[in-house]
């Protein structure tokens, strides 16, 4: 029987297969600092005299030349400074990247405010579909909160999150390299050095999640994206389980069967060691063209995972064979990575002996595959079944009641990098200290983000009183969030502006799908 692949495309809409998650709390707001320099009455009086002198030809204690003045256009944007309110109309639809049971994923361009002109992926989820099931709602919250909390070079970045009366919107970085699955589909199998690179970057992402008490639980080629340089980015955090530290287990039956650890199938309780089994299954898939245990149907696949011997092709090196055996141990306690060293145990294996981990984390190691892209908007690495469709975000005409909308309070988010850019853009610091400083209005910069209680989407009872944990330093921006207004209106919003596909100066056909993988594992294009 042919395996049905969850074909949601880029950043798939959550597929809540018996998932579990916990609600969280915490609201963040913008606080304005006190004026930098209000000035004394004497200074104001002196300023008044200065103005009088300027009215008479600039004669007086200050001679002001034009080189000391800064010109800028007076507009609504420059006068009403501060973070913009993000809404669907801020984005122009470019292409469809994927579809799922809960909504669509679009390639979009921001057309207003900060990041104007930049390309993103916009994940649109229908509230009415999500609230039908409590677990679906909880896992939507969990995915959004994990994306907010986790910042790492090999994990997708959340830029904005906002909502309307009937929809949730996640604005993510656009990863133009497409899915790792597409590369496997095209190449058939990877050489060991190629697989080593991808597995090393993935192991660093998994290790970072585990440090935060998060189990990923859905590692497979479809959930591994590549950026424009070819580096790995983990996506789709709907199956993650939080607050799983040493000694803690969970019992949810979830994941994709071919990559699922035996302890999940047996429902005997599992911990972060399941991710290392999945890494082994993924490694086997990369090197042989299929996962280690597959059957004609779901039951036979499960039986093989629980009972069958691992068959290793003779062409694999001794290091690859040894790593596969240690990752695919059915006894979770003896599995490589299950010990206190976690990712460090896996990374110390001789298979990774040529990896410089510091340079890898800094993304200084050249990827084995670099996408050939014609422009920032290039979608050639994505399935043309989706990209050739006309992008349409249906009108928001299914608004929930006010009580039903309460579960989505606190969904809104703005990435700290965006807040910093807004702060820098509107600082208007003079290059030369000018007398205008004494007579103009003082600047009011945006203050650092502060905690405040009362939100349903935070991270536990202590979130409102404790300082946010300082993240591990990576070669990227640090974490932080910003709460903005939540739209609860039941009014229907107009559809987003549409750009027709295959338009513009850059038009490139998707690469041909060379079907080298086994028939039952090939991409199922039926929705």
UniProtKB/Swiss-Prot annotation:
Enzyme Commission number(s) from the entry: 2.7.11.1
Modified residues (Phosphothreonine): 252, 412, 444
Residue span, AGC-kinase C-terminal domain: 353-423
GO MF term (any one): protein serine/threonine kinase activity
Motif (TOS motif): 28-32
Catalytic activity from the UniProt record: L-seryl-[protein] + ATP = O-phospho-L-seryl-[protein] + ADP + H(+); L-threonyl-[protein] + ATP = O-phospho-L-threonyl-[protein] + ADP + H(+)
CDD domains in UniProt: STKc_p70S6K
Biological processes, Gene Ontology terms: apoptotic process; cellular response to growth factor stimulus; cellular response to insulin stimulus; long-chain fatty acid import into cell; negative regulation of apoptotic process; negative regulation of TORC2 signaling; peptidyl-serine phosphorylation; phosphatidylinositol 3-kinase/protein kinase B signal transduction
Region Autoinhibitory domain: start-end pairs: 424-527
Enzyme class: transferase
Stretches for region Disordered: 1-54
InterPro entries: AGC-kinase_C, Kinase-like_dom_sf, Pkinase_C, Prot_kinase_dom, Protein_kinase_ATP_BS, Ribosomal_S6_kinase, Ser/Thr_kinase_AS
Feature: compositional bias, Acidic residues: 30-46
Record-annotated Protein kinase domain positions: 91-352
Post-translational modifications reported in the UniProt record: Phosphorylation at Thr-412 is regulated by mTORC1. The phosphorylation at this site is maintained by an agonist-dependent autophosphorylation mechanism. Activated by phosphorylation at Thr-252 by PDPK1. Dephosphorylation by PPP1CC at Thr-412 in mitochondrion.
GO cellular component term of the entry, any: nucleoplasm
Family listed: Belongs to the protein kinase superfamily. AGC Ser/Thr protein kinase family. S6 kinase subfamily.
Domain notes: The autoinhibitory domain is believed to block phosphorylation within the AGC-kinase C-terminal domain and the activation loop.
Assembly description: Interacts with PPP1R9A/neurabin-1. Interacts with RPTOR. Interacts with IRS1. Interacts with EIF3B and EIF3C. Interacts with TRAF4. Interacts with POLDIP3. Interacts (via N-terminus) with IER5.
The name this protein goes by in its record: Ribosomal protein S6 kinase beta-1
Organism: Bos taurus
Gene name, Swiss-Prot/TrEMBL: RPS6KB1
